[in-house]
Amino acid sequence: MLWAIQTFLPLSGKTNPTGRSSHFRKRCRHLSGILVGLLIFNGCAAVSIKNWQQHAAQLPAQFELHTVPFYPQEKYQCGPASLAMALGWSGLQIAPDDLTPQVFTPALKGSLQPAMVAAARRHGRVAYEIAGANALLKEIAAGHPVIVLQNLGLSWIPLWHYAVVIGYDLGAEVVILHSGVTNQKITALRTFDNTWARGKYWGLVVLPPDRLPATAEENSYLKAVVGLENARQWTAAIAAYKAALSRWQQSFSAHIGLGNSYYALGNLKSAEEVLLMTTRRFPEQGVAFNNLAQVLWEQGKKQEALKAARHAVMLGGPLVDEFQKTLEQIQADTP
């Protein structure tokens, strides 16, 4: 049996910005005149524009993406519309209506963040969560649109809304959004910061699997790639693990993930090559030898498989009982 190293967990979702169940009632409504007035008043609260400018010290002062398609949302459909825009930019042309069954919860009249993430992964895309101005600006400057969750209402009257950030101009103190029914919506940075803050600065980058996020961190990125495995998107997972290894050459988890993804795809030869290389680079890791033994055995290379399985048991560790099962399975099949 093949084993993966779960030094990171599949995304369960830091998805509750308010800490209350009302967070999940994401709405995409037009504000009434009264609420607009309240929002404008609240938008005048002090926010440090300098913080945004400091985050962009090494970035262009302004940047706009012109390759993100725009889909005007229908009522309550900001989730499907935003995801369709991000997927379209990544090279997958999918209409919002086709995404609605995957992300929209009719009883809530909205889309949950985990559903947005899961849908992106089912379509073979790396869904990478970010948070805060620094990450947002870096991703935009790298040419990556970012889905954001805003509360266009107030903390006690939430109006949840997904939009796609496609640009910024820090000199003019604005961000540029595909939002609602408005293409390239110019929004005051002060107002955007307030509405985004109420969503705990949650953002989502949706990328082709061979492309790393500008703000990628090893464990967070590999957790996102595990999501592709969970979605059985093996070809995409292979591309994403290769991208990870181009950045983190000594990542044991990326090596194991790549080998396991080849195995799941039925490409035993490539799985063997990757796992053999992994045992040489990480000779103290029993999982690598155990998985190599399984792949060798399934190719009929029983003596080599026995050697690898015995070595895994010799190395021991918390999974030694599983390694022993692999060894016994191979021994039972070996004359």
Describe the residue ranges of each PLM region.
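Active-site-adjacent structural segments surrounding the nucleophilic cysteine of cysteine proteases
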Residues: 43-109, 152, 171, 218-221, ...
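Conserved active-site-adjacent core of cysteine acyl-enzyme catalytic domains
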Residues: 45-69, 89, 94, 98-208, ...
